[in-house]
Each structure stands twice: as structure tokens, then as C-alpha cells.
Amino acid sequence: MLVLKKAASSPFRGQGVTVLGMSAGVGKTAVSIGILRSLSRRGVDCAPFKAVAVVTPDEYAGRSLPPWRRGVVQSCTAAGTVPRWWHNPVLVNLPDARTPVGDLYVRGRRLGRVPVTGADRLDLGSLPDRLRRRCQDAVEEGYRRLAGEVPWLLVEGAAGAGDLPPAADLANRILPELAGLPVIVVASARQADPADVSRLTDRLTPALRALLLGFVLNRVSDHPAADAAAQRLARASRLPVLARITDAPPPLGYDGSPEKIDLMCEYRASCVDESGLMRLLDALPAARPGLVEATR
């Protein structure tokens, strides 16, 4: 059985952050890529960890890769590392964006077909007990392995935090609580509804709420409107808006191809650097995330 072991008795003294999203499509992967590439530029040994990913064939950047490597190909490129199963232990490969059933890969191996609920969401409660346990064990083992290898980890959630019941949400609740890293929540300036913020904070477990640093307002194009959105978010959540990332067109020459991923990573890093978010992350003290240890 796998149990949580507090990091006080572990040699790992890493830093890192967990990036969650208000909902699917707010740009948390773009923010994550920017953070990782900004760190990599400075020679920081960093890596992404995504407990669960859902991918489709129309995602051009990973089309030439085995399905189980597609979920973190851009984030791993940003960090200067090669995708391994422990960067993304659980992945569902859908045949297309309209079909809610796909192939489940755990530790890089196909284990059958499973349903998903909405964009990028795998509900543990919908799986048979055997598959549910295998998924959770793989996520805990993958995180433990990566935490022992890399001193700076970025844990990325999936879809929207609070969309699934806590006990069924590997990506946004179970793993982030195990990691124990500071949490930032990405919100889109185009859809920052205070009611959604209130629902989000109500749905998060007390342990996860205690880790929250604040919000990153993404896709900012109208600065007066962003000021108003930031004030609404702060009032609804009683948390600060840590940074605002400007909405800008993709870099010249980017066509979504695998060969141009590096160009996009540089672009994302520049956007994150300009927002001031990296100064805040640099100021965080060394974290002591919980580590998963195997016991009999």
C-alpha cells in the first residue's frame, strides 16, 4: 500500500509550484510552459508533472509521438527534458474531440478503454476498482520518482479545479495535496466570474485551500477591464491576483508543428517574465512537499 510520508524525514528539499485552472481552456498549460522555460533559461533543473492528461489526434505538436508521451511534450520541451511516463503517469487518448471514450495509458501501457467527463477530466469514480487503484498508484509513484530526481517541480492540474468530487480528482486534489507545493490558479481575463471563484474556493478541500497563493489573470487584452476583473476576483476569493499575462498573437513563424515547439516555449516564457510572476516564484522559500513512500 502507498502512504504519504512527510518530507521532514526525506532528503528532498525541492522547490516548485502547482498550477490549477479555474476551468478548462484558461491557459494553465501556457502559463506552465512559460514558467518552466523561464527557469530553464537560467539553468534551473526543473520538470513538469501532470497526473492526468486527455489528448486527441488534432494536437499537432505530439502527433508523431506515442500517445502516452503527448500529454507533456510541450512542457518537457520547455524544461529541456524528454517525456517519460513518470512526467504524466495517466493519459487518455481520445480518437477525436467529440468522442468521450478513449484508450487509457498507465505508466506508458495501454490498459483498456475508459470514459472521460468533459474536457481533460478523468473521473476516478467512473473506473473499476482495479483500474482506479492502478491509476492512483502510478501517479503517486511517478511523483515520488520525479521528486527524487529534480529539485524544482511544476505540478499541472487538468481542466477545472473543483469540477470533480475531491475523492475522484487525481490531477486537481489528490496529487496537489500529496505534493504540498504552493498553488496558483489561472483565470482567464475574458471569463473571470466572481460566482465561479466562490464556487471554486468552496469546492476545494481545506488542505488545498491552505496552499493557495492567489490567481494569475491570463489573456489580458483590455487593461481597465482586467483591473476590474482582478478586483472582483480578489473580493470573491480574498486572495490576491499575483500577475497578469498579456494576450498576444503567436510568435511569427509558429505553425503548431513539433519543430516549432521551442519557438512557442520562448514566447510563453517572455509573456510570463513580463508579468512579474517569476519574481514572486523566485521569492518563495524552499518547499517541503509530502513524498509518497511505498510500505507493506
Explain the meaning of each model-derived region:
Residues 2-296:
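Flexible phosphate-sensing "switch/lid" loops adjacent to ATP/NTP-binding sites
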